[in-house]
């Protein structure tokens, strides 16, 4: 400065947060290009432009302030004060001088890898020579978890995994049954417009924030804490969470869960209605919406499906199922069930609250089943702890263990009494599935949750879990009847296969029963199958067999039986006989649930023995999907024509047909097309235009619903080029 010129306070004229450049470096450019969204543990640059002069290190002292939450507190780490010389305190932030020009200053700032995530206000205080002090608000930014930062507790080493579990905004959720695993496309849309704001709003609507906002904001640096808050907020059982659950088959005042194809419409509806819960969701919808929120916040997350999933309500690692003497499954008196499939999330994080070795993938289940510390949430439970039977480790590991490894006990109820029929040690936990990394294929990750069925290690882990449970609880009168501690049968010595028969021999009767399908059961067609009876003894056997069929919800809840039959079979020594069965479409069509699941059962008895034998099989009716064709190459900001081909698989007309389509980066909002009536076995197609607004790999998701079916789905992967 020239001699004689008065020294004035340094005044900021303009701040450039360099949002576009910073967001690219922080992998948040799809969230926004004009708002600063950065990740903790990684530097970002800003430029300060001054009014009157440049920054003079000997005469000017700059102090930065970063604040989050309604009551920023230095001690709690929600307020940070730091300068170019560093800072102290529980969560040190870093400021570095990058370039000092005539009237501007380029600065690099970095939040510590333990900083609380959320919305921040950045301020500056400048102390100049002779006591001049100026202070400014430089702007707002959003801070997220950083799986690219080795010091962050959500660090994930593999770049392909980071791309799949943080960046990818579409995927598949597996449904159906272990014999017919069906990939259902889903639009996570974590980078769609306003989704980041809705995710932060979700945190602020939590009970934790409402009770103690200061502490809640301070704890948001922990992915363990944050994931539990999000998990509780996805369902609405304790609060104004995102989704109402409904398994009643009555959805007249909302949306059938099977019709959803993405999270964006759900989250935006929740926000637009003043945070009123959206109607309705079931397990895969809860898990999909949670995946969207967690990926948006920066925690690596994937969606997991477990086929034949145990729901053990009383915590004894036994799933009790009850049948009457016709073979009909009864509404469970204890509410234990085996869900045909159940869907939850895995989130990747360190677990410093647990012994070494239990970090990595953690189970989080937002479906409201049981409470955890008074709230309807489940987890995070270490997948490693589940596999090792460490059911006493936080959080809710016992419940998660039972979902994949409980035993099943079958009971016959008659004359006010209960007779034990069978204890099955191999039913629960099959084909645990998730989408492959950067592929449309399915990954089977069952071995991450349990040792091979029938192995010594698997048996030892199960017994360890039982011993831990026995040490922490006492059994009630009814539980004593199904007490697994006194006599635990050995596990079947065979690996599971989707085609393995449900052969259940009785040691007393020396008779086995199993069902065999004669053809693949399709929606709208008759179901043909046989009951195979085998006499494994040297004596004659006179059998009476009561057969029944009833629809199931995917959570295992039975509906009204619609078919019954009685068979009398005489078996010569070591003879095998087949009893043919047929269920007409006209017999089951009016009784189907949305899930299109039918359970056939047979209860057998031999006239010279009081023992009973039970066999059952779950049938999933298949149906054709939707075909989507993209006509021509796709370019950003250029019209694209999409053709959708669909059909009515039934021999009767269906009404109220509605087609919905969506896809992040392809459609600004969900498209809804009224089709009306589809004639029997009629194939139809429509074309529509859209203008892609994001480049890269994208996906179109489609759903067709009618008065007779709700979830005929299809998808199409589309690569969108930037163009010229």
From Swiss-Prot:
The modification N-acetylalanine is found at residue 2. Residues 473-486, 495-505 have a biased composition (Polar residues). The keyword Metal-binding applies. Keywords: Acetylation, Acyltransferase, Calcium, Cytoplasm, Metal-binding, Transferase. It comes from the Eukaryota. It holds the Pfam family Transglut_N. This is Protein-glutamine gamma-glutamyltransferase 5. It comes from Mus musculus. The gene is Tgm5.
